[in-house]
Swiss-Prot record:
UniProt xrefs under HAMAP family: Ribosomal_bL36
Claim: Disulfide bond is one of the keywords in the record: no
One GO term of the biological process aspect: translation
Family (UniProt): Belongs to the bacterial ribosomal protein bL36 family.
Entry's Gene Ontology molecular function annotations: structural constituent of ribosome
Entries under InterPro entries matching the protein: Ribosomal_bL36, Ribosomal_bL36_sp, Ribosomal_L36_bact
GO cellular component: ribonucleoprotein complex; ribosome
Keyword annotations from UniProtKB, A to Z: Ribonucleoprotein, Ribosomal protein
Domain of life: Bacteria
Keyword Ribosomal protein tagged: yes
This protein's name: Large ribosomal subunit protein bL36
Length: 41
């Protein structure tokens, strides 16, 4: 999982990417292609 300063660009990389916020940490999750996982915060 990558830690990124900007997640907006990652969200547009794949159509199944979803942004999820848990306890103030923002995650990009992708069920079909897990290599797009990222987190911020």
């Amino acid at each position: 999982m990558k830690v990124r300063s900007s997640l907006k660009s990652l969200k547009g990389r794949h159509r199944d990417c979803k942004m999820v916020r848990r306890k103030g940490v923002i995650y990009i999750i992708n069920k079909t292609d897990p290599r797009f996982k990222a987190k911020q915060g």
